[in-house]
């Protein structure tokens, strides 16, 4: 089975870094892009400070894409991304996540922005594995 190409929204936060750990060497997913804000966009992922106690995972060298770029959907599509894991704040997620979903990406979000919206499932591992 070919791995599904995925991206993470958010580059420097703890949730993003936990996602990076979980996606490194995953049997189903290949992390090919990380999108960040003005403080991280354009930087190599390896240059961004690591906050977790566990060691930084070994990932391909990724340059952080600018999440505010109006062509972010096109950039992700060109990379072959079909799945996006979002670790961005709710106030940013409200604008970015619907745009990505409308462009055909499957979006899995940690943000609270859409937790109570009909038609958007809430995934809780202990309840719906």
Give residue spans per PLM region:
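N-terminal Rossmann-like NAD(P) cofactor-binding subdomain of oxidoreductases
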Residues: 1-129
